[in-house]
From Swiss-Prot:
Cofactor note: Binds 1 heme b (iron(II)-protoporphyrin IX) group per dimer.
Species of the source: Novosphingobium aromaticivorans (strain ATCC 700278 / DSM 12444 / CCUG 56034 / CIP 105152 / NBRC 16084 / F199)
Active site positions: H117 (proton acceptor)
HAMAP family registered for this protein in UniProt: Catal_peroxid
SUBUNIT field: Homodimer or homotetramer.
EC class name: oxidoreductase
Record-listed heme b binding positions: H279
Post-translation changes: Formation of the three residue Trp-Tyr-Met cross-link is important for the catalase, but not the peroxidase activity of the enzyme.
Site feature (Transition state stabilizer) residues: R113
Signal peptide: 1-27
Physiological role: Bifunctional enzyme with both catalase and broad-spectrum peroxidase activity.
Protein name as catalogued: Catalase-peroxidase
Pfam families xref list: peroxidase (PF00141)
Length: 747
């Protein structure tokens, strides 16, 4: 699955061993590796740091994919013997390797942590992170302080990946292995879906403003966390297990937990289930002080290290001498079995503060309670441990209520953990049609943004033609139809595959009320289209029906065809029916609010109060979320301006005397030297003055003018502004428009 960007160690539910922050990492003064060597030539970005960065629109190209552009991972996965893969993974669980021995003779907890940390980077604000793409293989995630020693987990898995090759991606294999780990230790999971294609390069993701591991410049005011971030410090998945910035205050830790897990789409019950369920298994590793023992992370390693990092030169370097998170110990007496011991121990003892051998703050029973077996040394026993973040589950009133309920009702605990684990590992996959394999659960879940299956016959080509005529006969204008269709489609995010035209949620709260969507105008358009649908469905034969979701797109198509004809180009905009109308009950309003556009340069919309990036940067961000290339972004902006499709009917960037005609006038008039541009009295607006008369010809925003000021965008704009470009412009616009209208649908 492709991930896009512009621009969560511990708690780690990781079950098992929150990969800590070796002391080396815990020290806030530890800087991240330098991005470039001193001898590296200056890049254009170095010379001109304020230059608009278009690279997000060029990542994950087919050129970087060794499988080639025709490779279809979904089809390969369908040929996979999933039962055989699971059998091989289960055998691996108890086949301990001398180079990295399994704790308690079972790799299950280790692999749960791997899967958790693969998926746990997901964040709701922009849909980035998550298990899709297998990004844990690449920098920076493969070298985050929170991911210490997970490089070994993936190396343990390599023989299985090697065996099944292209039939299973690393992204799917890591999640599946986490599931099998749970099942092999007696837990019944909710299910598993394949379908996560691998990425072949690191995502360009804004993980925070800091340039040092574990720094936290992401906060401002009264500990307000910067959007879209969902972790407390650079290099952590969620929170610091020792407490906020190492402050061992469970109540303050609870605040961080609630915010970070909430930004990963988890409510209080799901959060408690994940932490308590995860810490039922395995142990944390902090047998020695990292300084003087633990080497550099994988990305900073020498070529002979072959991508393995954090090499430990003290003692055995592994087993009972392992250093990962820096915390040390297990939560239960049976860390490789599903039990309620974590919750029982949490409430059974009075916990007192201590430090691990690595120096990390943790908690042990005040009582004489030495009953936890050592993971490697026979007959050696330890006290159970808790993190500050564990004690938060008993100290915080809301969390205490939930842990008490789970302790009294183990079945409810198991069910909550199973569901939360499934959500954690599948949240970024998008609609259910992308789920593959025999283990996909039948139950439909609200966070999957469900859409109903069609129970009627689809419209055919003749119906499409007739419906376009009916739509145009409603009296709705071309710009109104285009704006409604774009508002529906542009909600899509390629990061987590949410939004888009399917489901017709443009009719529902919250989308119908978003300022960018012109609510009053949109309501009028939808009322007219609903009338067309009602009339057609009442009269249609052969069981045919048409959804409003389809009509919204079809209306935009009809308007574009009409506008192209005005420009002298005959074109038929491709249309594929199949969209159905979701209900309000199928729509989680709070969840969908994260899709609300704070900016959409394609319709010249920008809310300055809600953005950390400039209008032009937010245009690139929107294009990135829509999986567009630089040329596609360019032609769409030019076309939408010509179609007079700005939000609220604003005139900025409508560089034409014939708005509503699909002409290349935007580019012709922007590139011509007849106009001189200057800042207007209104902030963020520019005036285009006739060089001869001094009269104002046009007004514009930075989003409009960047296509003339940025050298790369100007080069593309010149293609579309040429005298022979009108037909190419229309055809390219139609192709890009059609792509956007179909985002989030089966290809």
């Amino acid at each position: 699955m492709r991930k896009f960007s512009v621009s969560k160690v511990a708690l780690l539910a990781a079950t098992m061993a929150p990969a800590l922050l070796p002391a080396a990492a815990r020290a806030e003064g530890t800087a991240a590796p330098a991005a470039t060597a001193p001898a590296t030539p200056m890049s254009n970005r170095d010379w001109w740091p304020n230059r608009l960065d278009l690279s997000p629109l060029r990542q994950h190209g087919v050129e970087s994919n060794p499988m080639g552009g025709k490779f279809n991972y979904a089809e390969e996965f369908k040929t996979l013997d999933l039962a055989a893969v699971k059998k091989d993974i289960e055998a691996l669980m108890t086949t301990s390797q001398d180079w990295w021995p399994a704790d308690y003779g079972h790799y299950g907890p280790f692999f749960i942590r791997m899967a958790w940390h693969s998926a746990g980077t997901y964040r709701t604000a922009d849909g980035r992170g998550g298990a899709g793409g297998g990004q844990q293989r690449f920098e920076p995630l493969n070298s985050w302080p929170d991911n210490v020693n997970l490089d070994k987990a993936r190396r343990l898995l390599w023989p299985i990946k090697q065996k099944y090759g292209r039939k299973i991606s690393w992204a799917d294999l890591m999640v599946l292995t986490g599931n099998v780990a749970l099942e092999s230790m007696g837990f019944k999971t909710f299910g598993f879906a394949g379908g996560r294609a691998d990425d072949w390069e690191a995502d360009q993701v804004f993980w925070g403003p800091e340039n040092k591991w574990l720094a936290d410049q992401r906060y401002h005011g009264d500990r307000k966390l910067q959007n879209p971030l969902a972790a407390v410090q650079m290099g952590l998945i969620y929170v610091n297990p020792e407490g906020p910035n190492g402050n061992p205050d469970p109540l303050l830790a609870a605040k961080d937990i609630r915010e970070t897990f909430g930004r990963m789409a988890m409510n209080d019950e799901e959060t408690v289930a994940l932490i308590a369920g995860g810490h039922t298994f395995g142990k944390a590793h902090g047998a020695r002080k990292p300084e003087g023992c633990v080497g550099v992370d994988p990305a900073a390693g020498a070529v002979e290290d072959q991508g393995l990092g954090w090499n430990n030169k003290c003692g055995k370097g592994n087993a009972e001498d392992t250093v990962s998170s820096g915390l040390e110990g297990a939560w239960t007496a049976n860390p490789i079995a599903w039990t309620t011991q974590y919750l029982d121990n949490l409430y059974a003892f009075e916990w007192v503060q201590t430090r691990s051998p690595a120096g990390a703050i943790q908690w042990v029973p005040k009582e004489d309670a030495t009953f936890v077996p050592d993971a490697h040394v026979k007959d050696k026993l330890h006290k159970p441990i808790m993190f500050t973040t564990d004690l938060a589950l008993k100290t915080d009133p809301a969390y205490r209520k939930i842990t008490t309920k789970f302790r009294q009702n183990p079945d409810a605990f198991a069910d909550a953990f199973a569901r939360a684990w499934f959500k954690l590992t599948h949240r970024d996959m998008g609609p259910r049609w992308r789920y593959l394999g025999a283990m996909v659960p039948a139950e439909e879940l609200i966070w999957q943004d469900p859409v109903p299956k069609a129970t009627y016959a689809m419209i055919d080509a003749a119906d499409v033609s007739a419906l376009k005529g009916r739509i145009l006969a409603t009296g709705l204008t071309g710009p109104e139809l285009v704006r409604a269709a774009w508002a529906s489609a542009a909600s899509f995010r390629g990061t987590d595959m949410r939004g888009g035209t399917d489901g017709g949620r443009i009719r529902l709260a919250p989308q119908k009320d978003w300022a960018a969507n012109n609510p009053a105008e949109l309501a009028r358009v939808l009322k007219a289209l609903e009338g067309v649908a009602t009339e057609f469905n009442r009269a249609a034969k052969d069981g045919k029906k048409v959804s409003v979701a389809n009509l919204v797109v079809l209306g935009g198509n009809a308007a574009i065809e009409q506008a192209a004809a005005k420009a002298g180009v005959t074109v038929e905009v491709p249309f594929t029916p199949g969209r159905t109308d979701a209900s309000q009950a199928q729509t989680d309003v709070a969840s969908f609010e994260f899709l609300k556009p704070a900016a959409d340069g394609f319709r010249n919309y920008y809310d300055a109060s809600a953005n950390r990036l400039s209008p032009s940067e937010m245009l690139v961000e929107r294009a990135n979320l829509l999986t567009l290339s630089v040329p596609e972004m360019t032609v769409l902006v030019g076309g939408l301006r010509a179609l007079d499709a700005n939000a609220g009917g604003a005139r900025h960037g409508v560089f034409t005397d014939r708005p509503g005609t699909l002409s290349n006038d935007f580019f012709v008039n922007l590139l011509g030297m007849e106009t001189k541009w200057q800042k207007a009295a209104t902030d963020g607006v520019y005036e285009g003055l006739d060089r001869k008369t001094g009269k104002t010809r046009w007004t514009a925003t930075p989003v409009d003018l960047v296509f003339g000021s940025n050298s790369e965008l100007r080069a593309v704009s010149e293609v579309y502004g040429s005298a022979d470009a009108n037909a190419k412009f229309v055809n390219d616009f139609v192709a890009a428009w059609t792509k956007v209208m179909n985002l989030g649908r089966p290809s």
